Amino acid sequence: MSMAFENVDYTSLDIPAAPFSDPARIPDFPKNKVPRHIGVIMDGNGRWAKQRGMVRTNGHQAAEPVVFDTIAGAIEAGVRYLSLYTFSTENWKRSPQEVRFLMGFSREIIHRRVEQMDEWGVRVRWSGRRPKLWKSVIDELEAAEERTKNNKVIDVVFCINYGGRAEIADACAAIAREVRDGKISGDRVTEKMIADHLYNPDIPDCDLVIRTSGEQRTSNFLPWEAAYAELDFVPELFPDCGRDVLWRSIDHYIHRDRRFGGVK
């Protein structure tokens, strides 16, 4: 299946800026107020391409350098975890041609960029379901996870074939199997137990979710982990984003009053 697009040009439309190239530009955020975990819904690639008379796949290509500029900006700001909504379980509804491109492009990006991420101290993580996902994509993700497993600067989670409801359903199914096998009691299921069965239970809850393109919905992204996250809906299409947009959202977050249901 993955061989169908072997002759497709998967190169990006631009070259990303290197991290730490201009330290004077980095905002001086209070270290104790920077969100520990940020999730980004990378939306608007297709519209960006359409506005320029290009095909949708060109929008995805234009997004590649922005992804890594965003990662660089997160490192500079002191963010510890960054989850990127790369391909959802609902994205299989797109045209077969676009799905094939996205699968091949995801595989090639991980393969092409893993050395760079390793040099930056990125620990690559993957969150999502295995069924339907190309084996070649899984192989690249697992190889990148293995190569970078000891890195500690930032964990970057590529959410590929990910759906929040699917993640919760999978966690409940795993708990049900443990109940069936007599490992736990069915009447003692807790929130912590569900959290412990999510795809990456060691990653803390999401503090800030950013969605690009002006759309104001979360689209099944981290519903459990982002239950108390601050939301920032930015107008820019994703290929027009980068570290400056990320920093602006972090600044918005820092100036919000988080109460978690309580009163101050």
Swiss-Prot record:
EC number from the UniProt entry: 2.5.1.-
Keyword entries, A-Z: Magnesium, Metal-binding, Transferase
Positions annotated to bind Mg(2+): D43, E230
Disulfide bridge partners, by residue number: none
PROSITE patterns named among the record's database cross-references: UPP_SYNTHASE
InterPro entries referenced in this protein's UniProt entry, alphabetically: UPP_synth-like, UPP_synth-like_CS, UPP_synth-like_sf
Residue ranges the record marks as coiled coil: none
Pfam families on file: Prenyltransf (PF01255)
Any one GO biological process: polyprenol biosynthetic process
Residues annotated as catalytic: D43, N91 (proton acceptor)
Tagged with keyword Metal-binding: yes
Named cofactor requirement(s): Mg(2+)
Gene Ontology molecular function: ditrans,polycis-undecaprenyl-diphosphate synthase [(2E,6E)-farnesyl-diphosphate specific] activity; magnesium ion binding; manganese ion binding; Z-farnesyl diphosphate synthase activity
Annotated cofactor note: Binds 2 magnesium ions per subunit.
A cellular-component GO term for this protein: cytosol
UniProt keyword annotation of Transmembrane helix present: no
Residues that, per the record, bind substrate: 44-48, 56, 60, 88-90, 92, 94, 211, 217-219
Subunit record text: Homodimer.
Function: Catalyzes the condensation of isopentenyl diphosphate (IPP) with allylic pyrophosphates generating different type of terpenoids.
Family, similarity comment: Belongs to the UPP synthase family.
NCBIfam families: PRK14829.1, uppS
Matches recorded under HAMAP family: ISPT
Name assigned to this protein: Isoprenyl transferase
Origin species: Bifidobacterium longum (strain NCC 2705)
Gene that this sequence comes from: uppS
